[in-house]
Amino acid sequence: MLLPRINFEFIDDYIIDNKKISVIKIPSATHTPVSYKNEIYLRIGSNNKLAKEYPEKLRILWNKTSGFNYEETIVREKLTIEEVLNFLDYRTYFKMKGWDENKTSQQINDEMELDGFIVKEENYKFYKVKALGALLLAHNLKDFNLERKAVRIVIYNGITKSSIREQLEGKKGYAIGFENIIKVLKKYLPQEQRSINGRMEVFEFYPQAIIRELIANAIIHQDLSMTGSEIKIEVYDNRVEITNPGKSVIDLWRFYDCNKSRNEKLAYYMRQLKLCEELGSGIDRIVEISELNNLFTPKFIITNEYVNAKLFREKKFEKMVEEDKINILYYHCCFRYSIEDYMTNSSLRNRFLLDNSKPSTDRISNLIKKAKNMKLIKVGPNKSYIPFWAE
């Protein structure tokens, strides 16, 4: 009924004239107006009116009230210097930054205050911890009532959700717990020995570099203001799915070569700590690895409540559904354009590991025609094709 979902908090109950009165705290809208049955309402005088009938009033109201930044919210206060150092893993953080750990408690807290993780209270005796600091450095997110922001890993038997093999709940902040997430996943992701260029090497069905970027991308682009949902990594026999809460701030077909992120400070520190690529290059890097290794390009699904990235194991062209073929075609076109080259029938045949026969050429021609009709690509120079957004 309500989108995004609202967390109603019951503050207290009172008995007045033998009647129970409950005090309920309703948080204000932050990233988008709240809709009821897909409609947004405004109070005009004494009446509730559809906001779409008063677009200018909605714009003015929203501009005045939408300056909320979750990263800056205070998640714990009245902490001593020692308590701050107990709750936040400054040692791992300093090590990742290459800093000297041999500092006084005051010097350490000063560094974290400069980085915007904590702030002194007005009396200068105690500290407040910002959501940014807790989300990155918490020993245990539960200490800050942020346990629902932790990364959850679910391993399934088979290709459906019907049989859960194992379920793992994260508890650490994203920065200090990131490598452990990768380490845990590595145990469950399939790999095999293959002869590559005459040498036996370990072949990863899901390259670690792609998994890292998809997880970092989910962390950076999640909607932190949403309640009751977390980042979820699901491993099936035939695919990996990574889901983050919140509607994407980027259009589905502009993930490539786009540098907009929802949580700017979170993204900044994830890059500083070498946990993800530079701004805007994460998806580009994923596509590059997929292209160079003839792997499935991740398929992204956007809804009003979440973004889901699906990464499939190898699959021959004949066994792919059309939606997956179009997805690979589009990102192949983007990649070729980014290296100052263009997609052709021949390059796309090679991408799908098809031969040069007329049936293969015809199948690729039909696929290109469908992508053109969907307005995902357009004609480039010399019988080539470029992404719809290319100049």
Where are the model-predicted features located?
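A short, conserved structural fragment
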Residues: I118, F296, K369-N382
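Short amphipathic alpha-helical interaction segments
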Residues: D355-K370
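Active-site helix-to-loop segments that bind/position phosphate- or nucleotide-bearing substrates
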Residues: H31, E39, G45-M226, V235-N238, ...
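Long, low-complexity, charged/polar intrinsically disordered regions in eukaryotic proteins
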Residues: L141, L273-V321
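Short, cationic-aromatic polyanion-contact patches
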Residues: V379-E391
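Short acidic, hydrophobic short linear motifs in intrinsically disordered regions
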Residues: I339-F352, N382-K383
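Glycine-rich/acidic phosphate-handling loop/turn and adjacent ATP-lid/helix
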Residues: V240-K274, K315-R336
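Divalent-cation
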Residues: M1-Y41, N47-K49, H139
